[in-house]
Regions:
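Sec/Tat signal peptide C-region and signal peptidase I cleavage site
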Residues: 16-20
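Bacterial N-terminal signal peptides
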Residues: 5-15
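Non-catalytic cap/lid and distal C-terminal segments of serine-dependent acyl enzymes
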Residues: 21-25, 30, 36-37, 42-61, ...
């Protein structure tokens, strides 16, 4: 657990460069901007430019990433407009950010908000070379709907989101993937930041993936203080998920209610939750997936016949060697283990979008 905590400390999204380069002035509005808003902007080199009108302010800084890492200092013109460009190119994909104006942390009014860092953060999308797999296309689309389910464990009603594939008609039964968000996020993360529904729609339309249901629940991770991952007890969420949510889903949707047709996966802390729950309740899930959230060992899982698939992934800027080594160890012990390394990404959503894209076709074969 200590090793995993170290992996998760550096949740930065801005990629620094060791050399300066001339910035191309081909900036265009980010696709995540509010309607009619020009800024923030991105260019073909993956630089981001921010602007805000704050005539009375004395300083404006943009901090990027989960928890607000680093800082791009904006400069003020004669009209009270602050503008600044990142020092270097950013990694492809989605990034959280926030503005600090005279010490007050605020969101950028030019862009949409996304839940992360235990607050609503601003979001920016850096165009990716492979963004076609989560693009909005003219294909049959599934539905993402909100559900409210009672929990005996907490005595409260909880919210989750459910993706139903285009083929869901209330008659045929489908397998289910329980897909968890990371620290500081909530049940909206995988559909809003991760585009899980679009990834699935496109894979299904291309015949690369079997249709299945995805359940995205709040993982209680916001009860964890920054830096407290190693001491967090996943047992409470284990009981909410397995004893409350799974039976609710099986009774309210057309599911194939057996272990061989259930999977669990998660990103970052959601991966840590996945590991805990799949090992604690091996009778519930047949497919395991950890995205940037740790490793499995043969000693932890036990009998290889208990699990259909073990999927491990991370960004190439994280701990790829550990992922590859763990996967080879599992294979040698008789497990169906698959690894995936997202090239050019760190601990960020582009790595996890790609991980879902790679894992989904392997499920429920």
């Amino acid at each position: 657990m200590k090793r995993i905590s170290i992996f998760l400390i550096g949740l930065t999204c801005l990629t620094g460069t060791a050399f300066a380069q001339e910035i191309k002035e081909d900036f265009v509005p980010s696709v995540m901007n509010q309607p009619g808003q020009e800024y923030p902007m991105v260019n073909s080199q993956r630089y981001a430019r921010f602007r805000i009108h704050a005539p009375e302010a004395q300083s404006v800084i943009v901090s990027l990433g989960l928890g607000g890492q680093g800082g791009t200092v904006l400069t003020k013109d004669a009209n009270g407009v602050w503008t600044g460009t990142t020092a270097g190119p950013m990694d492809e994909g989605f990034h959280y950010y926030r503005m600090t104006i005279d010490g007050a942390v605020v969101n950028d009014p030019g862009t949409k908000n996304y839940y992360g860092s235990v607050r609503w953060e601003s979001g920016i999308e850096i165009p990716a070379h492979d963004q076609d797999f989560y693009a909005m296309k003219d294909v049959p689309h599934g539905q993402v709907s909100q559900i409210l389910y009672p929990s005996k464990e907490t005595g409260q009603t909880h919210r989750a989101f459910v993706y139903l594939p285009p083929q869901y008609d209330g008659k045929k039964k489908f397998p289910v993937l329980y897909l968890q968000h990371g620290w500081g996020e909530d049940e909206t993360a995988w559909s809003n930041q991760g585009h899980a529904n679009l990834i699935m729609d496109n894979l299904i339309a291309e015949g690369k993936c079997k249709p299945f249901i995805i359940v995205m629940a709040y993982g209680m991770t916001n009860e964890v203080k920054w830096g407290g991952l190693a001491s967090f007890d996943f047992t409470k969420f284990e009981r909410v998920l397995v004893d409350d949510l799974v039976p609710y889903i099986d009774s309210h949707f057309k599911t194939i209610a057996k272990k061989e047709m259930r999977a669990m996966a998660g990103l970052s802390m959601g991966g840590m939750e996945t590991k805990h729950i799949t090992l604690a309740r091996p009778e519930t899930f047949g497919y395991y997936g950890i995205f940037s959230g740790g490793l499995y060992s043969p000693e932890e899982i036990g009998d290889p016949s208990k699990v259909k698939l073990v999927f491990l992934s991370c960004g190439s800027k994280e701990y790829p060697d550990a992922i590859l080594k763990a996967t080879e160890t599992l294979k040698a012990a008789g497990y169906n283990a698959v690894s995936y390394i997202s090239e050019g990404t760190a601990h960020e959503f582009q790595a996890w979008r790609r991980s879902l894209k790679e894992m989904a076709p392997l499920l429920f074969r």
